[in-house]
Curated annotation (Swiss-Prot):
Oligomer and partners: Forms a heterodimer with a small (regulatory) subunit (CAPNS1).
The name this protein goes by in its record: Calpain-1 catalytic subunit
GO cellular component, one term: cytoplasm
Active site: 115, 272, 296
Residue intervals of the Calpain catalytic domain: 55-354
Length: 714
């Protein structure tokens, strides 16, 4: 068969962002309506290839060295020498996608350090429902084969349908990366390729945690527990997690490479990911004993200590209960006491699933909320609490906890509301090839004081954080893709502040709330408004004679000041203020000032108009000096935010991002002329809107002419 090269269609720019938001509101990105990754439609592409008799070749992730990697697996690396790309049909006469269902033996690690990903894939094989949410049915190398396959992955709040061709990296006639033990099944190798595609390359998959794979295959949120310092109610947490259909994994840390695969005296394997499949209390000689059921998906080596299959402890358990609990299949599944579990294992991971992944009506489900956000230099990247001058500019989110946990959920403890917070930074694996790795991230939780409870969702300012300590926080700031922590707090309102550790570190993030009871959430942001003074109505007689004399001197014979003359005047005046950092006013900024003040529409300023502008600039100068806190002659981007508010404008964080991008220098400094231009522009746009909003409903409608008139000449 010939190959058909398909080139993806990309949509870029602001219009794409608007289009994406509208589509999301209509349900695009849910699992049942997954986004076609890079615009590639599996059914259409497959049909086209079948019709033309060609095999699919994916130019969005082509079979070239750059798809392998950028450093250790880069184009000039010795590790990639001799690698070719071949289809399974070129390697075998009868390749298979899946044989007799997916099993752990389908997943053997190759020459890539992505065991974390393979452990997550192996866990999927234990749950057919979850597996086939990722690996859709109906794919094969026989009926309807066209060299194209697809998989569904969760990516930062959205499900995407990822198309791949079946050209796989081969060296010495064998698959370089993931392969099956039998050598004739290829679903796992193709799934790995799809995951490499969304992350930019195979090398981008090197190094990670199983929880990352769990989340991208389920859309769930993961909790980590170091068992040496686990909370006292961990057994109850495990019971609740199993009750909610969560995936649980645990492992024994290794101290060196030599420890990997080492088997302990009681037949536990170090460095392997075990699954927790059950928990039960049993009556043992008159006392209740907490048990944990485990499974080693990698083999049939089983625990031989207390409560193992052949242990004597079972002889002291009621026969009926014993039959209900005892594992009869030799499949690596076994029971052990919770006390032994805490002593023998090192770490526990719990992946809490979203309601859409849980089809059973008997399973209790989490209440979930997801927010997307950004950290941008100078506007929303304030760093952690160690930086009080800027911490307050970070994005903020409010949680309202009303319902306490059920009394029987956690025993006799004090009542409270349980929830999990998870902060995830986006696209960092994909950006490794550009030298950008994980930022150090975390979050803090603040209790809203009584006087602010129920108030509008306004962004909290610096004074609040200077006066109030955090009520809770992430366990640490760390350079992982996700930081998550379980909390239990009294009913009330709380504000969550996600941040990077240091200020001015840029990135996109997802913040997720998983609560056991319903909880109200909202993003805190200021409402856009302007407290502008009424436009002055002056006559020439009211203007000071000294100012009139100055105007006559500046305006010339026509007694009006043009844009060019205004620029000369302002730059001459500003040059005398040696304490100001400025490059002078541009013609464009002076044109904006004239447009704001020009009442008769002749493109020039008369005496009254110039007088009003002059007084306004003097006011701007006093504000500028007030917020130039270090007297450097310029303001920082964060100082500018406070200065804009002092001038009467309240803006949301997105507008501040745009303003800083447009009016600050590369070092985030804002000089006086840019500050004036910004305020003039803001006032002009607010006044235009106010004029057009005749019914005062906060909405105006433009035809194309009015839109162009406003944007081109305002």
């Amino acid at each position: 068969m010939a190959e058909e090269i398909i080139t993806p269609v990309y949509c870029t720019g602001v219009s794409a962002q608007v289009q994406k938001q509208r589509a999301k509101e209509l349900g695009l990105g849910r699992h049942e309506n997954a986004i076609k990754y890079l615009g590639q439609d599996y059914e259409q592409l497959r049909a086209r290839c079948l019709q033309s008799g060609t095999l699919f070749r994916d130019e969005a992730f082509p079979p070239v060295p750059q798809s392998l990697g950028f450093k250790d697996l880069g184009p000039n690396s010795s590790k990639t020498y001799g690698i070719k790309w071949k289809r399974p049909t070129e390697l075998l006469s009868n390749p298979q996608f899946i044989v007799d269902g997916a099993t752990r033996t389908d997943i053997c690690q190759g020459a890539l350090g992505d065991c974390w990903l393979l452990a997550a894939i192996a866990s999927l094989t234990l749950n057919d429902t979850l597996l086939h949410r990722v690996v859709p049915h109906g794919q094969s190398f026989q009926n309807g084969y066209a060299g194209i396959f697809h998989f569904q992955l969760w990516q930062f709040g959205e499900w995407v349908d990822v198309v791949v061709d079946d050209l796989l990296p081969i060296k010495d006639g064998k698959l370089v990366f993931v392969h099956s033990a039998e050598g004739n099944e290829f679903w796992s190798a193709l799934l790995e390729k799809a995951y490499a595609k969304v992350n930019g390359s195979y090398e981008s998959l090197s190094g990670g945690s199983t929880s990352e794979g769990f989340e991208d295959f389920t859309g769930g949120v993961t909790e980590w527990y170091e068992l040496r310092k686990a909370p006292s109610d961990l057994y109850q947490i495990i019971l609740k997690a199993l009750e909610r259909g969560s995936l649980l994994g645990c492992s024994i840390d290794i101290s060196s490479v030599l420890d990997m695969e080492a088997i302990t005296f009681k037949k536990l394997v170090k460095g392997h990911a075990y699954s927790v499949t059950g928990a039960k209390q049993v009556n043992y000689r008159g006392q209740m004993v907490n048990l944990i059921r485990m499974r080693n998906p990698w083999g049939e080596v089983e625990w031989t200590g207390a409560w193992s299959d052949s242990s004597s402890e079972w002889n002291s358990v009621d026969p009926y209960e014993r039959e209900q609990l005892r594992v009869k299949m030799e499949d690596g599944e076994f029971w052990m006491s919770f006390r032994d579990f805490m002593r023998e294992f090192t770490r526990l991971e719990i992946c809490n699933l979203t309601p859409d992944a849980l089809k059973s009506r008997t399973i209790r489900k989490w209440n979930t909320t997801l927010y997307e956000g950004t950290w941008r230099r100078g506007s929303t990247a304030g760093g952690c609490r160690n930086y009080p001058a800027t911490f307050w500019v970070n994005p903020q989110f409010k949680i309202r906890l009303d319902e306490t946990d059920d009394p029987d959920d956690y025993g006799d403890r004090e009542s409270g509301c349980s929830f999990v917070l998870a902060l995830m930074q986006k696209h960092r694996r994909r950006e490794r090839r550009f030298g950008r790795d994980m930022e150090t991230i975390g979050f803090a939780v603040y209790e809203v004081p009584p006087e602010l409870v129920g108030q509008p969702a306004l962004h909290l300012k610096r004074d609040f954080f200077l006066a109030n300590a955090s009520r809770a926080r992430s366990e640490q700031f760390i350079n992982l893709r996700e930081v998550s922590t379980r909390f239990r707090l009294p009913p009330g309102e709380y504000v969550v502040v996600p941040s990077t550790f240091e200020p001015n570190k840029e990135g996109d993030f997802v913040l997720r709330f998983f609560s056991e009871k319903s909880a109200g959430t909202a993003e805190l942001d200021d409402q856009i408004q302007a407290n502008l003074p009424d436009e002055q109505v002056l006559s020439e007689e009211e203007i000071d004679e000294n100012f009139k004399a100055l105007f006559r001197q500046l305006a010339g014979e026509d007694m009006e000041i043009s844009v060019k003359e205004l620029r000369t005047i302002l730059n001459r005046i500003i040059s005398k203020h040696k304490d100001l950092r400025t490059k002078g006013f541009s013609l464009e900024s002076c044109r904006s000032m004239v447009n704001l003040m020009d009442r008769d529409g002749n493109g020039k300023l008369g005496l009254v108009e110039f007088n009003i502008l002059w007084n306004r600039i003097r006011n701007y100068l006093s504000i500028f000096r007030k917020f130039d806190l270090d007297k450097s002659g310029s303001m920082s981007a964060y100082e500018m935010r406070m200065a804009i508010e002092s001038a009467g404008f309240k803006l949301n964080k997105k507008l501040y991002e745009l303003i800083i991008t447009r009016y600050s220098e590369p070092d985030l400094a804002v000089d006086f002329d840019n500050f004036v231009c910004c305020l003039v522009r803001l006032e002009t746009m607010f006044r235009f809107f106010k004029t057009l909003d005749t019914d005062l409903d906060g909405v105006v409608t433009f035809d194309l002419f009015k839109w162009l008139q406003l944007t081109m000449f305002a």
